[in-house]
Amino acid sequence: MQATKIIDGFHLVGAIDWNSRDFHGYTLSPMGTTYNAYLVEDEKTTLFDTVKAEYKGELLCGIASVIDPKKIDYLVIQHLELDHAGALPALIEACQPEKIFTSSLGQKAMESHFHYKDWPVQVVKHGETLSLGKRTVTFYETRMLHWPDSMVSWFADEKVLISNDIFGQNIAASERFSDQIPVHTLERAMREYYANIVNPYAPQTLKAIETLVGAGVAPEFICPDHGVIFRGADQCTFAVQKYVEYAEQKPTNKVVIFYDSMWHSTEKMARVLAESFRDEGCTVKLMWCKACHHSQIMSEISDAGAVIVGSPTHNNGILPYVAGTLQYIKGLRPQNKIGGAFGSFGWSGESTKVLAEWLTGMGFDMPATPVKVKNVPTHADYEQLKTMAQTIARALKAKLAA
């Protein structure tokens, strides 16, 4: 892989994972992804982050297209997750760096991942600066974005922010800059990444942005460890504003309905609800759990105002695809949502109670009584569903107007 020049002395190195579709084992990456590392040439030439271990050869080739890897003096490891630090042992062997800089929690994570004995590790503190020669870098801890060890690196004179996982997207492309990607594609990839990885840490996101802005960080280049680089002040402002928007989790007039069904009764109910919400002027997304991955459902929920869940009763509970999706969503802590529950049953009928408990447990408002139907829905049942949709739509409109 050839390095990509960002500005004089700054190069993107790393690897493109064209085949990635299962990112971190729990979320889809339908466009693939990248593992970005950044080479900064100076009196102390420094590599920021590495790549997954299996891509170490591509990383070394990228570095070698700029300089001999043995000329690297420093390594900065901003985050120890193995898609960014997996190639660290190979880099240490190839480069023999004078020092390896990381956060205090990064040092602990490095020890527990690699069990090293004699690496030249040096801890840097929040706000600490390091001179590389002509250039100076400042480190800022960004804990829980999205690991405890996370930090970013800021070059004030060059206005370059190496942001680690923050502002990342799962995009594998020959284009390496944000202004080369259609804005709707970029924004969707950013939202999917944030919703499925960073969303539990929305308060930390807002705090980190406040801290960085307060420290005078106003980048013209944002260099994340996944996806494309944001190039230009306007592009960087776009990225920051989107993160604030995602973290604030303000509701919209969008309703997501997800469900599973055995003999189509719950599916019929879901379709009636979708049409009823549309009649109320809502934007509707109807998602069958067997056709839609849980991360796709969460991506749609991230900017929705209401989430309606359906399942038939199964062994006094709910179907496993619905249960798994709810468990996944709960861990991501969506806020400011209205909920609703529906489902069919044969004899015991507990599913709607279980669904309502899930949604209430996630802090969702529940303005409408769940609707349950014995076996196959009738016209009267459909009228109940329409009433449910009207009640939730009114509550959503009131929430948006507040």
From Swiss-Prot:
<comment type="similarity">
    <text>In the N-terminal section; belongs to the zinc metallo-hydrolase group 3 family.</text>
</comment>
<feature type="domain" description="Flavodoxin-like">
    <location>
        <begin position="255"/>
        <end position="393"/>
    </location>
</feature>
<dbReference type="InterPro" id="IPR016440">
    <property type="entry name" value="Rubredoxin-O_OxRdtase"/>
</dbReference>
<keyword id="KW-0408">Iron</keyword>
<feature type="binding site">
    <location>
        <position position="226"/>
    </location>
    <ligand>
        <name>Fe cation 2</name>
    </ligand>
</feature>
<dbReference type="InterPro" id="IPR036866">
    <property type="entry name" value="RibonucZ/Hydroxyglut_hydro"/>
</dbReference>
<feature type="region of interest" description="Zinc metallo-hydrolase">
    <location>
        <begin position="30"/>
        <end position="216"/>
    </location>
</feature>
<comment type="subunit">
    <text>Homodimer.</text>
</comment>
<dbReference type="InterPro" id="IPR001279">
    <property type="entry name" value="Metallo-B-lactamas"/>
</dbReference>
<dbReference type="InterPro" id="IPR029039">
    <property type="entry name" value="Flavoprotein-like_sf"/>
</dbReference>
<dbReference type="Pfam" id="PF00258">
    <property type="entry name" value="Flavodoxin_1"/>
</dbReference>
<protein>
    <recommendedName>
        <fullName>Rubredoxin-oxygen oxidoreductase</fullName>
        <ecNumber>1.-.-.-</ecNumber>
    </recommendedName>
</protein>
<feature type="binding site">
    <location>
        <position position="146"/>
    </location>
    <ligand>
        <name>Fe cation 1</name>
    </ligand>
</feature>
<dbReference type="GO" id="GO:0016491">
    <property type="term" value="F:oxidoreductase activity"/>
</dbReference>
<dbReference type="InterPro" id="IPR045761">
    <property type="entry name" value="ODP_dom"/>
</dbReference>
<feature type="binding site">
    <location>
        <position position="79"/>
    </location>
    <ligand>
        <name>Fe cation 1</name>
    </ligand>
</feature>
<keyword id="KW-0560">Oxidoreductase</keyword>
<dbReference type="GO" id="GO:0022904">
    <property type="term" value="P:respiratory electron transport chain"/>
</dbReference>
<feature type="binding site">
    <location>
        <position position="83"/>
    </location>
    <ligand>
        <name>Fe cation 2</name>
    </ligand>
</feature>
<dbReference type="GO" id="GO:0046872">
    <property type="term" value="F:metal ion binding"/>
</dbReference>
<keyword id="KW-0249">Electron transport</keyword>
<dbReference type="Pfam" id="PF19583">
    <property type="entry name" value="ODP"/>
</dbReference>
<keyword id="KW-0285">Flavoprotein</keyword>
<keyword id="KW-0813">Transport</keyword>
<dbReference type="InterPro" id="IPR008254">
    <property type="entry name" value="Flavodoxin/NO_synth"/>
</dbReference>
<comment type="pathway">
    <text>Energy metabolism; electron transfer.</text>
</comment>
<keyword id="KW-0288">FMN</keyword>
<feature type="binding site">
    <location>
        <position position="81"/>
    </location>
    <ligand>
        <name>Fe cation 1</name>
    </ligand>
</feature>
<dbReference type="GO" id="GO:0010181">
    <property type="term" value="F:FMN binding"/>
</dbReference>
<feature type="binding site">
    <location>
        <position position="165"/>
    </location>
    <ligand>
        <name>Fe cation 2</name>
    </ligand>
</feature>
<keyword id="KW-0479">Metal-binding</keyword>
<dbReference type="GO" id="GO:0009055">
    <property type="term" value="F:electron transfer activity"/>
</dbReference>
<feature type="binding site">
    <location>
        <position position="165"/>
    </location>
    <ligand>
        <name>Fe cation 1</name>
    </ligand>
</feature>
<comment type="function">
    <text>Catalyzes the four-electron reduction of one oxygen molecule to two water molecules.</text>
</comment>
